[in-house]
Swiss-Prot record:
The keyword Transferase does not apply. The chain crosses the membrane at residues 9-29, 35-55, 72-92, 106-126. It is found in: Cell membrane. This is UPF0715 membrane protein YoaG. Pfam families: UPF0715. Keywords: Cell membrane, Membrane, Transmembrane, Transmembrane helix. The lineage of its organism: Bacteria, Bacillati, Bacillota, Bacilli, Bacillales. Its main location: membrane.
Length: 134
């Protein structure tokens, strides 16, 4: 059981780190300021850790009962959950922004990136786990 929990934590940590680095890089490209990029990366890492922990890890535990690596259906499920989580995050921060959120390319980019990142790390770590026989 401890071994399986370590795989969930590894997926959570690596996904959050990748998400933070991706948004930090995006911020650096958009604004050209390293301080803003580092701050964005740190905030995104924390945001990713909390949101992945609340939404993705329980879903991952449910999906791991029939463990399949690089399953496109899992990517679609993670995408739907990512869209819901990002929508809730945007609406909680700015309740009057529902129309803006749905029109924003950043909402779609953030949701798809979050889903793909988690799905990729989940599949890679699951592949490693099944190869080691755990």
């Amino acid at each position: 059981m401890k071994k399986i929990a370590s795989y969930y934590l590894m997926t959570l940590g690596l996904s959050s780190l990748t998400f933070g680095l991706l948004l930090g890089f995006y911020s650096f490209v958009m604004y050209g300021d390293m301080i803003i990029a580092l701050f964005t990366a740190a905030i995104a890492l924390l945001y990713g850790f909390v949101v992945y922990g609340l939404f993705a890890v329980p879903l991952q535990m449910k999906l791991q009962k029939k463990a399949r690596t690089f399953n496109v259906m899992y990517l679609l499920i993670y995408s739907v959950v990512a869209f819901i989580a990002a929508f809730l995050f945007f609406v909680i921060n700015e309740p009057a922004s529902i129309a803006w959120t749905l029109q924003s390319y950043f909402y779609y980019m953030l949701s798809i990136a979050a889903a793909v990142i988690y799905w990729l790390w989940d599949s890679l770590i699951l592949y490693k786990r099944t190869a080691s026989g755990v």
